[in-house]
Amino acid sequence: MGKNRKSKRQLVRDEKRAKKRGLEIEHEEERDIKKQRREEEAHQDAFAPVTDAGYVPPPLDGTYDENAFPGGPEEGRRNGPNTNFEREFFGMLAEQEQEYFRHADELLELNDFPSTEERDIFLQNVYKELRGKELKVASSQSCSRLMERLILLSNTRQKKSLFDAFGGHFISLVTHRFASHCCEKLFLQSAPVVTQELSGEYEQEPLPEGEEETEAMKSSMEDLFLLTLDELEEHLGYLLTDRFGSHAIRALLVILSGRPLDQAGTKSMLQSRKKEYITVEGAAANQSELSSQIRAVPSSFTMAIKKIIDDSTMTMDATALRVLAKHPTGNPTLQLLLELELTMFVKGKEKKEKNKQKKDDEEAEEKKEETQSEVTLLGMLVPDAPAAFADNTTQAAEFVNSMIYDPIGSRLLETLITHCPGKIFKGLQQHIFGPRIQSLLRNDIACYPAIKVLNRLSREDLADAVEKSLPEMASFVDKGRFNVIRTLFERCHIRNGTDEINALLKALTSAYGNDWKKLVPKLCMLDEDVVEEEQKPDPKFQTQEAKNKAFMLNHGCQLVAALLAIPGQPSKAIQASLAALKPAQVMKMATTSHNTSSILVKALQTPATNPTFHKVLVSSLLPHVYELATSQQGSAVLNEIISLPSKPAEPNAPAVPFHMKENIISQLANYESELRETWLGRNVWRTWKGDMWSHRRHDWVRWAKETDPETARVAAIPRKREEKEKEEAEKKPKGYLGKNFDPKKLKGFAAKKFEKKEAEA
């Protein structure tokens, strides 16, 4: 048979297609670069504040005239961000190089390697090919993903070599659409190495043959980060509002502070919602445990944060800071700077002053004057606080009042309220939030800063806020402010405000017709048509009405869960409402969304106010066992049932009767073949130990009763006949021969043995 070769015409056609594809990629990259420049110019223009306030915005051509300020060049250097840098163009990869790196990216994503050894050899070849082309690959639209995957797989030596390759070009890289993601990934993956080197746990990797050790490899990771900061320092004012550079600054600030890198709050701060999640097989092995916990950082990092905050306050006046507070890109960075200042420096200084004994009054006055003379970010935002809050015409009061109703500025206000010193918070509460707390809680934007205020209120101030909010409960319900109601209940529970909890529950029930049974159907929207999570369209294509409905459902379910967790009347009300639901409504809760199904899981875990509560809840689900097992949300409810004991260890403790568990497993056994076809079904079958039920039923019964109290479990588990007889024999007195024993019936050796025992007795 002849070989299957391509004809000359096919080869020419393939070559033309490859050239056409390469040209298309080049045009796309050029178009993206031009688009990026236009966006940056518009971005700089959007940052321009009021021109008569002494602040001169940077021009669109990237230059900055320091003499444009009334005070001359000195004021220009102080008030203007330095944007006088020329963005570098690192060139483009050749067609063959681009095709090679794109193919390598596809192979790494698919992870289709015969063995790990071949995969390691492949990676070594990719690293060799990458040498000298790091900047081109990082700024390439089609190959930057490969760079991110390689960073995830890199060891410490390779990360340091990337710092060396990027060095001197970081300002162009962090402001580039694609290269900025590579820089962020490099920063975040290198952060744990600093702690390892600091503690002495780091071990140097062996150098491959034929490779020379560079100066960057000999340097510590701490020095490499500090060199990067030195390079970005003069452009800090510009990077605060740059679309891509601001993310890199936030990542560096989080790394310098030693905060956990894998927390949900940290990830949402560093990445936008549209950020593509890039991973690769084997990255988890390189992931350090330090990423998920607070890391020890050197003192130079703390000093670097202080310098960044000081430079930020020096390069902008109060007006520029207020404009930055309402800037969509600059606000998150300003939030992080303010939070770090309040948590690392202001509160730390207060503790030192409390613990340190003052020798005399003169030294105390000198220290007070020094602290007052220090310019802080908090002092620039709310000068002369807390005394200034008493007068609405002061700069501090105007700033807070202007931020309360602003959708972007209110987020900065939340950070300020959460972390500010107690004296400033008391001033905010007494003069701004306290007198009008009920109206602020009604507003869809101002309610979020007001909720942060509720979280810090004392017992007496919280009782006063509840008293003012009770008449507004019907308005809260109509406007869907369930997060406000939940916060009021939770804070009263933490502050042991039983009377306030009962008053809030009464007001909430009256808003729903004074009937506890209506609470769950209304809050969980069981009477409305809610689209299941599996059938929901992409968030980009959802209508605003659908988004609002999902938002209200989420907050309503959180309120139900909070009430269920509060013992007493709130828990009793929710359990009564759940017990009164129709089986179809319970099934809808179990299968519609994660929010509603989690309520059923928590209800099964909560001690019952009515002894039959758990039994009633499970009986509503019994006719739909197969539907639950194949549902993403319902399977969690089904798995929770088997984890509960069959008999309560104490009165009102969570328990599901054993005959109900047997009913469920027997129904699952009827659908065994169907369950094995789906991942969810296999998970439920494995959790309920269906194979044990089919082949060793007495072992399954014993396993199912392991969660029961010790006394009930021993009495109920079926045992073998020999075990029962042995246990009964141990309970009988020594020499006992049974109540029906007749010595006359004994014959032979047994009779002689009995007569001998009688004679000895």
Swiss-Prot record:
Name of protein: Nucleolar protein 9
Protein purpose: RNA-binding nucleolar protein required for pre-rRNA processing. Involved in production of 18S rRNA and assembly of small ribosomal subunit.
Record-level Gene Ontology MF annotations: RNA binding
Keyword Nucleus attributed: yes
Keyword Hydrolase: no
Amino acid composition bias (Basic and acidic residues), ranges on this chain: 11-44, 350-371, 719-733
Compositionally skewed regions (Basic residues) per UniProt: 1-10
Lineage: Eukaryota, Fungi, Dikarya, Ascomycota, Pezizomycotina
A Pfam match: PUF_NOP9
Lineage top rank: taxon: Eukaryota
Ranges where the record places region Disordered: 1-56, 350-372, 712-739
Family classification: Belongs to the NOP9 family.
Residues in Pumilio repeats: 129-164, 165-200, 231-271, 395-430, 432-467, 620-666
